């Protein structure tokens, strides 16, 4: 810039540029390539002779066309720029506007405005609105400052420019306050520019919007040094614009600004519209439309804030064309006023009111501006009778049932010559050709027929349509209609038209000829009648055949179903994917299909072999789990009995010595005679487990039992109860063996001081993730098991289903919820082979560990695994005190294998009967396997007795050596006897040992429901078919006898001979559990000696839920003796040895009541069908299940079936 010269415009002048200063940074540099007017926002500095006073120059040299006028302006500018500063360079100043249009107006002298202070934009608009001279320099000067402040860099040349322009402004007209070109920017030390700079931020943006909003673009501003290099001849080569823009003040409708292209479009000189009302140029018939658009657009603009961007409404009007000398020559008065159609785009803006440093405009809506971009509409036809292509644009016309046009597309204007407001409100029948009315009648008949089906459309024959210039065009139309679904009346008809053949006259906007087509009266009456018939037909009710309705409903239902499936597929495919091991046989269980209604989006994926298939959601699995929990809770289906009377404990009948402390002594009351069956008398049976615990709550006790076995099992149990005190108890059972097994059980709650874990979100999320994986894995396993289960016969399945109803037991109201343990997943207790075969020594039973330590009345249990002498594994458990009972109980319980004669004798054997129950009452799973090779010494038939025996299986370890193994070391009369005990003695010892460890009571006449009642696979039909049949019973329970086992045989372990003795008597005992069919309390005869309690909590073979007793409650006789070898117990055939057990210990094979260890009895989860334990204080009627005495089998491999006899 310094010292440089260039001649880029005819209006540029060389100016001294020597007065550079860095003191002001508010002046703006020229924006290159802009097509807007430029305003100078800088003031002259003191170096240029103005002392920093605001410049009042205003230059709008639009009318300057001849170059000779530039000379005087150059002189004045050079003269002013030379004051007070030497010229170090020259700069080009452009004082012409970029929006200059060829004008026919004469320049008007501008008033002198030197020294005038700046005004706000609001004052400017008010000045214009009040009719002040638009060429007043102060207004123009202010806008120049506003415009000049928009660019980002400053140049000192503006100071020189301001000095020159201030003089030049006095001799040039300024017709438009918004169109002045800025001169090259300079870095002047200008004072007071800040106001102009901030004020410009709004209108400069507005000016840019005006230019960009309209199709008409003006040529770039003459080049500024460093910007565009526009040549001098570019101004003369400016093309004509096809549209123009104008700005209107919404205060009074005055035009504030127009683009110069208005001259090319309408012929008006550019500033002829300034100061005039815009509506004066609108055709009279379109003024109402224009006003309607304005009143509609203003609220929209105001509701969108100060600057509603791109809120443009479009409509069509006719604008008046200029009648000048060029277009009309002389005699203007005699020529008619001509109008041309334009499509107007309205955009509402707000003028800036208040300047802010952040250039944010604040407006209260008082200075609303309307920006109008007008585009002329041209005719679509170029030649007469033009045949248009199929791709020609379509336009829509909608009319009501009476034929009145209600909507017209703006696209129809160029095709028909009518503006939309010209057609709206008129009858469409007036535009049809008279000869085509018959065709149109047929068309409307088809419209009514198609109206029966919603959305149906059809194309009609071509017909002629009248256009604006009086000619006809041939239209092809696709018709649709809308029928009111309630009134079944036609609401409107929509025609999507396409011009097939154009009119004879191409200019569709020409005025139509005044002459009308002559027609005979007969033809007119005929056409009028056809029009009336069409209107009547359209007014009829649209009938819909029932078949059509059904088809539509069916189609819509199918569409809806398809949509919903797609939607559910998208929604339900969560990110939860669990990588599970590949399984060979993945099948779909019937339960899944029923639960999901056969419409689950996951249904298709169940058979997938992929390990990444989408599993059911966690919510689905949790829902299934909750269902299981509900059914397992045994909802009450029969009234509950009153609390049974309590009886005092009987006198001890034997010399069974208990090592328990005082509070624990009732546990070990009973008889333990030396072999006579009379020790287990009716009296002792009657009061069995019916003792009211009166011992001190909260005190702990220890019980130890010793035996001659070689296995050692230790366990600790903790539990909670309703007592107020706390107590601890430990139960230890010791044997002389070397194998040890241990287990422990924890409980939550109670009064024991356990530090609770702080529940955090992370911990909760972790738990949820683990539960999701756990449940998904269980789901996968449960589906995979069905492939390897042997299928039972159809009849067995029917039987199972037939009796599955009674299988649901009654929920006992008084039962404990076992909050701490109820919902824990069952633990599969497994030991390594070293632990299983830990016993190497002499023959001996396994001593289970017992003992509950916990709150008084607690029920904590402990289970232990101890090795037998032959390397097998047995399990024993301990339990806490019952409610109201001692704080803890411990006893040594063991499964003692009996050795001796190969055939057991019929006599019973002595045991220690227990008169108090320390076990949480759980239902019993019937899973007593009996070896098939042993003879069953059944003295009474189950079918005749009508009693389904509660069967308990006592696994007895067998040494492979001799029957001369040392007897159990009970605190018993025959402890330590060196002689070889008889079979009955060994059995008695085993029973006594087990009874001490786990005192259990079994109820006569009660068949405890099968563990998995929710879903029983057909494979379990044989074992469960007869289980659910309630049968009346009159006989007594039979004694259980354990026969001698063959030595060294593979199946010697866990084999028992069960013989039944004839029932002796049946006596009703108050408060006992009764069968639904025969509510009589069955008592055990003395001959049914103590084999009953010999097996509680024995190794895996014992049905753990057999602990049906309730604390401190009614006398419940034991039912153990009633099993013979024909019982349809769980099958342990080698074919069925492999069982699938889920993660909760539930075996899907229902034959064995397969569940995990005894310990799992007390961590009752939701899978088992057994309910929480009953308290004998609130007994309920139980349904008696009967099982046919057939298909009895003995467990061959107790190691494998260890988890098949625990409670679910």
UniProtKB/Swiss-Prot annotation:
GO molecular function: transcription cis-regulatory region binding; transcription corepressor binding
Signal peptide interval: none
Keyword Cytoplasm among UniProt keywords: yes
Composition-biased stretches (Basic residues): 66-79
Annotated Gly residues bias: 698-740
Positions of region (21 X 2 AA approximate tandem repeats of G-[TN]): 698-742
Keywords: Biological rhythms, Cytoplasm, Nucleus, Phosphoprotein, Repeat
Listed SMART domains: PAS
PTM description: Phosphorylated with a circadian rhythmicity, probably by the double-time protein (dbt). Phosphorylation could be implicated in the stability of per monomer and in the formation of heterodimer per-tim.
Cited InterPro entries: PAS, PAS-like_dom_sf, PAS_fold, Period_circadian_regulator
Domain PAS: 242-377, 395-501
GO BP term, pick one: entrainment of circadian clock by photoperiod
Annotated Pfam families: PAS, PAS_11
Composition bias, Polar residues: 679-697, 1127-1138
Sequence motif: Nuclear localization signal, positions: 66-79
GO CC, alphabetical: nucleus; perinuclear region of cytoplasm
Subunit structure: Forms a heterodimer with timeless (TIM); the complex then translocates into the nucleus.
Domain notes: The run of Gly-Thr is implicated in the maintenance of circadian period at different temperatures. Deletion of the repeat leads to a shortening of the courtship song cycle period, and thus could be important for determining features of species-specific mating behavior.
Name by which UniProt lists this protein: Period circadian protein
Gene that specifies this protein: per
């Amino acid at each position: 810039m310094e010292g440089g010269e260039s001649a880029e415009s005819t209006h540029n002048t060389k100016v001294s540029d020597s007065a550079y200063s860095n003191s002001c940074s508010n002046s703006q540099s020229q924006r290159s390539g802009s097509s807007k007017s430029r305003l100078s926002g800088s003031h002259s500095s003191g170096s240029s002779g103005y002392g920093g006073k605001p410049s009042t120059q205003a230059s709008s040299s639009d009318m300057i066309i001849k170059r000779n006028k530039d000379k005087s302006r150059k002189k004045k500018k050079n003269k002013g720029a030379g004051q007070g500063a030497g010229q170090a360079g020259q700069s080009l100043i452009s004082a012409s506007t970029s929006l200059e249009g060829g004008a026919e107006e004469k320049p008007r002298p501008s008033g002198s405005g030197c020294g005038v202070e700046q005004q706000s934009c609001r004052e400017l608009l008010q000045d214009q609105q009040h009719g002040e001279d638009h060429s007043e320099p102060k207004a123009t000067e202010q806008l120049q400052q506003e415009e000049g402040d928009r660019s980002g860099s400053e140049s000192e040349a503006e100071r020189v420019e301001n000095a020159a322009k201030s003089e030049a402004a006095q001799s040039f007209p300024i017709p438009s306050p918004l169109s002045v070109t800025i001169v090259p920017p300079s870095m002047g030390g200008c004072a007071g520019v800040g106001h102009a700079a901030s004020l410009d931020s709004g209108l400069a943006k507005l000016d840019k919007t005006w230019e960009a909003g309209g199709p008409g673009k003006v040529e770039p501003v003459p080049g500024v040094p460093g910007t565009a290099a526009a040549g001098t001849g570019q101004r003369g080569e400016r093309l004509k614009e096809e549209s123009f823009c104008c700005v209107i003040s919404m205060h009074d409708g005055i035009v504030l600004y127009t683009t110069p292209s208005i001259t090319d479009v309408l012929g008006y000189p550019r500033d002829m519209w300034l100061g005039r009302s815009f509506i004066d140029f609108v055709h009279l018939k379109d003024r109402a439309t224009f006003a309607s658009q304005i009143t509609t657009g203003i609220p929209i603009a105001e509701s969108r804030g100060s600057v509603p961007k791109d809120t443009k409404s479009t409509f069509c009007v006719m604008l008046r064309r200029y009648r000048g000398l060029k277009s009309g020559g002389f005699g203007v008065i005699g020529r008619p006023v001509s109008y041309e159609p334009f499509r107007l785009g309205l955009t509402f803006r707000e003028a800036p009111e208040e300047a802010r440093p952040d250039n944010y405009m604040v407006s209260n809506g008082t200075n609303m501006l309307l920006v109008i971009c007008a585009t002329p509409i041209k005719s679509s036809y170029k030649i007469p009778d033009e045949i248009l292509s199929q791709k020609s644009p379509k336009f829509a016309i909608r009319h009501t049932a009476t034929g009145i046009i209600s909507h017209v597309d703006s696209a129809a204007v160029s095709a028909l010559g009518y503006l939309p407001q010209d057609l709206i409100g008129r009858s469409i029948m007036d535009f049809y050709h008279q000869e085509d009315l018959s065709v149109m009648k047929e068309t409307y008949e088809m419209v009514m027929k198609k109206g029966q089906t919603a959305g149906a459309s059809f194309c009609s024959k071509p017909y002629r349509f009248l256009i604006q210039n009086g000619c006809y065009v041939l239209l092809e139309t696709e018709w649709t209609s809308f029928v009111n679904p309630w009134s079944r009346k036609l609401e409107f008809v929509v025609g999507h038209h396409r011009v097939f053949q154009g009119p004879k006259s191409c200019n569709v906007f020409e005025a139509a000829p005044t002459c009308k087509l002559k027609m005979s009266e007969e033809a007119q009456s005929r056409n009028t009648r056809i029009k009336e018939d069409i209107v009547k037909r359209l007014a009829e009710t649209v009938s819909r055949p029932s078949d059509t309705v059904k088809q539509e409903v069916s189609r819509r239902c199918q569409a809806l179903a398809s949509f919903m499936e797609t939607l559910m597929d998208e929604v339900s495919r969560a990110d939860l994917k669990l990588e599970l091991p590949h399984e060979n046989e993945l099948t779909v269980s019937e339960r899944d299909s029923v639960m999901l209604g056969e419409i689950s989006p996951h249904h298709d994926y169940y058979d997938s072999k992929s390990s990444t298939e989408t599993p059911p959601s966690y919510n689905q699995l949790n829902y299934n789990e909750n269902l299981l929990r509900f059914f397992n809770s045994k909802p009450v289906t029969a009234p509950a009995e009153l609390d049974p009377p309590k009886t005092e404990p009987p006198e001890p009948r034997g010399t069974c010595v208990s090592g328990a402390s005082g509070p624990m002594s009732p546990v070990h009351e009973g008889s333990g005679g030396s072999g006579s069956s009379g020790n287990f008398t009716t009296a002792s049976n009657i009061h069995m487990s019916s003792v009211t615990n009166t011992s001190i709550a909260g005190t702990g006790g220890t019980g130890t039992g010793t035996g001659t076995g070689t296995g050692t099992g230790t366990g600790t149990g903790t539990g909670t109860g309703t007592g107020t005190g706390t107590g601890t108890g430990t139960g230890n059972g010791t044997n002389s063996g070397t194998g040890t097994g241990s287990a422990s059980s924890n409980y939550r709650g109670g009064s024991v001081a356990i530090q609770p874990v702080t529940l955090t979100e992370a911990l909760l999320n972790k738990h949820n993730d683990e539960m999701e994986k756990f449940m998904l894995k269980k789901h996968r396993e449960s589906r995979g098991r069905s492939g390897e289960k042997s299928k039972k016969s159809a009849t067995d399945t029917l039987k199972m289903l037939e009796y599955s109803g009674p299988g649901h037991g009654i929920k006992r109201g008084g039962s404990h919820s076992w909050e701490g343990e109820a919902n824990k997943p069952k633990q599969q207790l497994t030991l390594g082979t070293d632990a299983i075969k830990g016993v190497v020594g002499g023959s001996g039973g396994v001593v289970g560990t017992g003992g509950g330590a916990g709150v008084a009345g607690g029920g904590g249990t402990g289970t232990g695994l101890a090795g037998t002498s032959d390397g097998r594994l047995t399990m024993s458990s301990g339990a806490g005190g019952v409610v109201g009972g001692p704080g803890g109980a411990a006893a040594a319980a063991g499964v003692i294998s009996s050795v001796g004669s190969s055939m057991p004798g019929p006599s019973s054997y002595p045991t220690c009967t227990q008169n108090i129950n320390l076990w949480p009452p759980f239902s019993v799973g019937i899973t007593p396997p009996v070896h098939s090779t042993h003879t069953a010494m059944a003295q009474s038939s189950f079918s005749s007795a009508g009693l389904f025996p509660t069967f308990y299986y006592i696994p007895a370890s067998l040494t492979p050596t001799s029957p001369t193994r040392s007897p159990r070391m009970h605190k018993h009369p025959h402890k330590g006897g060196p002689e070889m005990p008889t079979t009955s003695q060994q059995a008695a010892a085993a029973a006594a040992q087990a009874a001490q460890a786990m005192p259990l009571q079994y109820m006569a006449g009660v068949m405890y429901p099968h563990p998995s009642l929710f879903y029983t696979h057909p494979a379990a039909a044989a074992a469960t078919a007869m289980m659910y049949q309630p049968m009346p019973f009159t006989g007594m329970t039979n004694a259980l006898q354990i026969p001698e086992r063959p030595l060294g045989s593979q199946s010697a372990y866990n084999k028992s001979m069960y013989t039944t003795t004839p029932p002796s008597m049946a006596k009703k005992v108050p408060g006992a559990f009764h069968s639904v069919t025969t509510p009589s309390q069955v008592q055990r005869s003395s001959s049914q000696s103590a084999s009953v309690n010999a097996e509680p909590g024995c190794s895996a073979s014992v049905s753990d839920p057999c602990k049906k007793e309730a604390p401190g409650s009614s006398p419940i006789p034991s039912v153990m003796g009633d099993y013979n070898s024909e019982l349809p117990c769980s099958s342990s055939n080698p074919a069925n040895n492999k069982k699938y057990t889920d993660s909760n210990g539930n075996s899907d094979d229902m034959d064995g009541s397969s569940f995990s260890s005894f310990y799992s009895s007390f961590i009752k989860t939701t899978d088992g069908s057994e309910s929480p334990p009953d308290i004998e204080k609130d007994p309920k009627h139980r349904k008696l299940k009967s099982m046919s005495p057939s298909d009895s089998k003995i467990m061959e491999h107790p190691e494998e079936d260890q988890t098949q006899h625990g409670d679910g």
